[in-house]
Curated annotation (Swiss-Prot):
NCBIfam families assigned: minE
Species of origin: Trichodesmium erythraeum (strain IMS101)
Family to which the UniProt record says this protein belongs: Belongs to the MinE family.
Gene3D superfamilies given in the database record: Cell division topological specificity factor MinE (3.30.1070.10)
Pfam families cross-referenced by the UniProt entry: MinE
InterPro entries in UniProt: MinE, MinE_sf
UniProt-recorded name of the protein: Cell division topological specificity factor
Record key words, sorted: Cell cycle, Cell division
Transmembrane helix listed as a keyword: no
UniProt-listed SUPFAM superfamilies: Cell division protein MinE topological specificity domain
An example Gene Ontology biological process: cell division
Function: Prevents the cell division inhibition by proteins MinC and MinD at internal division sites while permitting inhibition at polar sites. This ensures cell division at the proper site by restricting the formation of a division septum at the midpoint of the long axis of the cell.
Length: 95
């Protein structure tokens, strides 16, 4: 039912922009249901990037952090493009 309302409200001739609107709305709903404010999400993003960066070199300019919501749960999805695997652990990891 929610999808039908979204389609009626945001129908456009361009299916790509319609899909983008649906994706953004789902993201807003997931953020709202998870009760996470933008500051918390940014802090989580930084912490995740810091930990993953100990093991691999990532392209953080193209990284994505999304909250996805289905009827049962809200999930944090991190898409982190890997440039290369680090040969040795960084100093932080050894401590």
């Amino acid at each position: 039912m929610l999808n039908e309302i979204i389609e009626k409200l945001f129908y456009r001739n361009n299916p790509k922009s319609r899909e983008e609107v649906k994706r953004r709305l789902k993201l807003v709903i997931a953020h709202d249901r998870a009760d996470l404010n933008p500051e918390i999400i940014q802090a989580m993003r930084k912490d995740i990037i810091d930990v993953v960066s100990r093991y691999v070199e990532i392209d953080d300019t193209d990284s994505e952090f999304l909250l996805e919501n289905n009827q049962r749960a809200t999930s944090l999805v991190a898409n982190l493009p890997i440039r290369r695997i680090k040969a040795k652990p960084t100093q932080d990891q050894e401590d």
